Amino acid sequence: MSIPADRRTFLAATAAGVLGLSARGQVHAEQAATETAQPTSPPFSLGTVTYNIAAEWDLDTILRVLPKVGLTHVEFRTTHKHGVEPTLSKEQRQEIKKRCADAGVTIWGLGSVCEFHSPDPKVVDGHIETCKQFLQLAHDIGAKGVKVRPNGLRKDVPEAETIAQIGKALIPCGEAAANLGTEVWVEVHGSETSKPSRMKAIMEACGHKNVGICWNSNPSDVVDGSIKPSFEMLAPWIKSCHINALYSGYPYRELFSELRRINYDRVTLIELGEKLDPQNGELLLKYYRKLWQELCS
């Protein structure tokens, strides 16, 4: 049976329209898929610890180099050339705060060497007081927190006793931090104390909301090629994060994925053992940032 010309025209136009819509729909779907696949910027930032790459840079050099290489945050490690120490006067603290702000560099934290495992109570009390001094400095210059560290287990008492001692010593530090609007970050540190299960026990022994963990990207984090078991164990307390040589074989892509998963929106801080002059340091940091961006994607 022949189809009238007007009906043939209608069917042809309808078919063309359907094909056109289908094609456009396919293009839109492909565009949406492409857009979905595009890597998004991580919620966390990249900064550096002055240990050890900038250990011999003065404050002027730090504030010149970091913005040039695209780093936004710094953790000032004690004893380094920058001179950011609890001995600073009120006026000097205000000046440092202003200079960093003017340079666009956020003072993320202060790296102390306070530790709390000594068998001598007076030594422990001294470290607590030093931590409080650093917390006051952090408050005065606008830093978020102070890094401390466990650095060993006593040999004269059971392990659990040393862990309880460290946790208990952190409580007055946390109380001081709360009063100042700052935090205490316990670095996953020490040949014995860096074991994630021991760090978890220290956090539980402390139990103060202003005391958390500074993830330290240690080889001991890795279990059967993955950091996931260690990360999940410590995730509730992670408040800061140190990262090291990105070529080391440590599963950094997995770490950054895990940080995304817990909505970590703070800072990952470069911590390298080598001391470099500003020219070579600037070059290294540029390459480091590019590789960090790729691993975060």
Language-model features: where?
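Histidine-acidic metal/acid-base catalytic patches
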Residues: 2-47, 54-72, 193-297
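A generic secondary-structure micro-motif detector
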Residues: 51-52, 85-86, 124, 163, ...
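Active-site acidic/histidine proton-transfer and metal-coordination neighborhood
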Residues: 14-22, 33-40, 60-67, 97-109, ...
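Extended hydrophobic secondary-structure segments
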Residues: 70-82, 184
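Glycine-rich, proline-tolerant flexible connector loops at the mouths of alpha/beta enzymes
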Residues: 77-95, 151-156
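Short glycine-centered, acidic/aromatic-flanked micro-motifs in structured strand/loop junctions
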Residues: 50, 78, 114, 150, ...
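Residue-level preference for long, well-ordered alpha-helices that form the structural scaffold
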Residues: 89-92, 120-123, 127, 159-162, ...
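Conserved beta-strand positions in the central sheet of alpha/beta enzyme cores
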Residues: 75, 109-111, 147, 242, ...
